[in-house]
């Protein structure tokens, strides 16, 4: 094998093995705005009910208490790349639903010209042998314009998380949202089947 073939093979190997999550600065998502919770006084940041209501809930409802359905984190950044790492509570499997629906996360970007949220990407969880307490990592997007934009990460539907870290370029700004969107205009309660929440 001549030297050029060897260099080409090494170059291809290095390209394939390069870590797409390298060089990020991660910050705890609780530093930013957590939205879509009915109460702020929950025992953990990504659960939906205060502990005081748990005694009156059936066991099946207590299981759902740990699911982060509907909860999202709002932030603004000028990073050219955005990633996330999160720690799943249960990491279980359902035969009838894709893992993205059970324990994936979704990144949205606010198109300020149109005043609409646009889907950017979804974290497709790795099985990790279905061990509870597994850590998931995702590079959502890269090659952004480097301007400040508003973002939102929706948390898993049928699982919960212990913690979430937002990853940005090491020199990028990562701040609380600058725009109130969605706006707080009172509370809405919707009662229905699992179809209501996207199941």
Question: How should each PLM-predicted stretch be described?
Answer:
Residues 1-20:
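Bacterial Sec-dependent N-terminal signal peptides
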Residues 15-187:
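N-terminal secretory targeting modules
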Residues 185-199:
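Catalytic nucleophile-elbow at a beta strand-turn-alpha helix junction centered on a G-D-S/GDSL motif
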């Amino acid at each position: 094998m001549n030297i050029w073939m060897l260099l080409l093979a090494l170059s291809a190997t290095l390209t394939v093995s390069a870590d797409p999550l390298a060089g990020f600065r991660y910050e705890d998502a609780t530093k930013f705005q957590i939205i879509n919770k009915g109460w702020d006084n929950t025992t953990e940041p990504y659960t939906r009910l205060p502990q005081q209501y748990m005694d009156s809930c059936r066991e099946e409802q207590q299981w759902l208490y740990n699911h982060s359905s509907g909860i999202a984190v709002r932030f603004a950044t000028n990073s050219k790349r955005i990633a996330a790492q999160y720690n799943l509570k249960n990491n279980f499997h359902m035969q009838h639903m894709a893992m993205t629906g059970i324990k994936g996360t979704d990144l949205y970007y606010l198109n300020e010209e149109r005043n609409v949220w646009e889907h950017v990407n979804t974290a497709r969880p790795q099985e990790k042998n279905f061990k509870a307490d597994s850590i998931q990592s995702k590079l959502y997007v890269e090659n952004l314009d480097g301007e400040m934009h508003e973002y939102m990460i929706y948390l898993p539907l049928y699982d919960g998380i212990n913690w979430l870290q937002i990853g940005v370029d090491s020199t990028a700004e990562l701040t609380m949202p600058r725009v109130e969107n969605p706006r707080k205009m009172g509370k809405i309660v919707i009662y229905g089947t699992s179809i209501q929440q996207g199941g």
